[in-house]
């Protein structure tokens, strides 16, 4: 998380790391209730503009039923891919935009000049205005 936090802060973004992000509960960063509470806290915090997932994983599906109403009431960009696509589908079903984009894990394992990382930055800052097929 330190590497990803550093990248985001270098973009002049404020970063809040959820309470249980670095915890361990089996294969997950916390129990279902802990992860649900972290996610809800981010959704209801007016200072939080987007939720950038740290990594994908099957644990995302555990949150779907509990977040259905929260996502609709407090729309924010949910950013990630892989198993995070389950959260994207929930967002779309509630009319909320989300971003299929790099997660924290990839901000640190990919070079800062990675095209997807740069597109994410441009989208977050409203600078990305073109969608086209890549060569």
Label every model-predicted segment.
Residues 27, 87-91, 108-114:
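Short, charged, surface-exposed secondary-structure boundary motifs
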Residues 67-91, 97-104:
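Short, acidic/small-residue loops that bind anionic groups at enzyme active sites
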Residues 43, 49-53, 79:
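Short glycine-rich or small-residue beta-strand-to-loop segments that form or flank ligand, phosphate
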Residues 1-47:
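ATP/NTP phosphate-donor binding region
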Residues 14-16, 49-50, 76-77, 96-99:
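Structural motif
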Residues 97-135:
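Conserved anion/nucleotide-ligand pocket segment
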Residues 35-39, 60-66:
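N-terminal active-site wall of soluble small-molecule enzyme domains
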Residues 52-61, 81:
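N-terminal glycine-rich "phosphate-gripper" loop used for MgATP/nucleotide binding
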